[in-house]
C-alpha cells in the first residue's frame, strides 16, 4: 500500500510517470533520471508484507526500494527491485491508487521489451495508448504503435484497466537488451516523455554516463535480488512475434 511521508500532500496533478525493474531495467533507469533532472522530492513509499527488509543507499541516504516522487505538474512512481509476477496486480492497483490520489490527468508507463528473434542493434521505441487521445499523441510524435500483440505484466494490466475505466494511459516500450541494464534504451523513452509532456529533461548525463549507470543499476538489482525468490521467467515484458 502507498504510505506517504508525514504532512505530505499527494495532490500533484499533471502527468504521472512510472517505471519498474523489467527488461533492460529501462523503467527504473528512466524514472531515476527524470527524478534527478527535475529535482523531484520524495512523497512516500510503497509497503507490502512480502517486501524484503532492505534499504537501498543513494548518495549516503537509505531508501525503500519502491517510492513515489512529486514536482510541479509531475509525479513519478519507481521500483528498484524486481518482484515475482504474483505481485503484478497488487502493484498495478497501487499505481492506480497513487494516480487517483494525485489527481493526475494521464499516466505514462516506461518499460523495456525484448524480442528474442531479433538481433538488437540501434533499438526501437513502441507505444500503446489506452484511449484514443493517447493514441493520437503517439501518432503525432511518430512513435510506432503496436497493432497486434501482447504486453504482459504490470504494464499490460494497467493498459487494460485504462481501456476499461477510460483512464488516459500511454505505455512507452523501448526495445532493450534482455541480458543487462540498457541506459540507451531508457534515454529513448525519456526523450519521448519530454515530447509527450513538453517538459525539458536533459539527456546528456544519461548518455555520457551510460556505462557507469548500467553498472550501478546492475549492482543494486543483483544485491537486492539476493533477498528475493527468483522471479518467474515470464515476468519480462515480451511482445508477441505477430506484432509489427
Each model region followed by its residue ranges:
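Gly/Ser/Thr-rich loops at beta-strand to alpha-helix junctions
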Residues: 20-26, 83-85, 112-116, 152, ...
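Extended, histidine- and acidic-residue-enriched regions that form the cofactor-binding/catalytic faces
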Residues: 168-244
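Short beta-strand segments
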Residues: 18-19, 77-78, 109-111, 173-175
Amino acid at each position: 500500500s502507498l504510505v506517504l511521508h508525514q504532512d505530505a500532500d499527494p495532490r500533484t496533478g499533471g502527468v504521472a510517470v512510472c517505471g519498474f525493474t523489467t527488461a533492460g531495467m529501462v523503467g527504473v533507469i528512466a524514472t531515476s533520471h527524470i527524478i534527478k533532472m527535475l529535482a523531484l522530492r520524495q512523497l512516500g513509499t510503497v509497503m507490502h508484507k512480502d517486501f524484503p527488509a532492505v534499504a537501498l543507499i543513494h548518495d549516503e541516504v537509505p531508501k525503500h526500494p519502491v517510492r513515489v516522487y512529486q514536482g510541479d505538474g509531475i509525479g513519478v512512481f519507481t521500483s528498484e527491485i524486481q518482484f515475482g509476477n504474483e505481485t503484478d496486480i497488487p502493484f498495478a492497483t497501487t499505481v492506480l491508487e497513487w494516480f487517483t490520489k494525485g489527481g493526475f490527468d494521464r499516466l505514462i508507463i516506461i518499460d523495456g521489451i525484448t524480442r528474442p528473434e531479433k538481433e538488437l542493434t540501434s533499438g526501437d521505441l513502441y507505444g500503446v495508448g489506452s484511449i484514443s487521445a493517447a493514441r493520437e499523441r503517439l501518432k503525432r510524435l511518430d512513435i510506432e504503435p503496436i497493432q497486434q500483440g501482447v504486453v504482459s505484466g504490470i504494464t499490460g494490466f494497467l493498459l487494460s484497466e485504462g481501456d476499461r475505466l477510460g483512464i488516459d494511459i500511454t505505455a512507452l516500450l523501448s526495445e532493450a537488451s534482455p541480458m543487462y541494464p540498457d541506459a540507451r534504451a531508457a534515454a529513448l523513452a525519456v526523450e519521448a516523455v519530454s515530447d509527450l509532456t513538453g517538459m525539458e529533461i536533459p539527456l546528456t548525463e544519461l548518455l555520457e554516463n551510460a556505462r557507469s549507470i548500467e553498472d550501478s543499476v546492475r549492482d543494486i538489482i543483483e544485491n537486492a535480488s539476493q533477498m528475493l525468490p527468483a522471479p518467474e521467467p515470464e515476468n519480462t515484458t515480451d511482445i508477441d512475434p505477430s506484432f509489427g
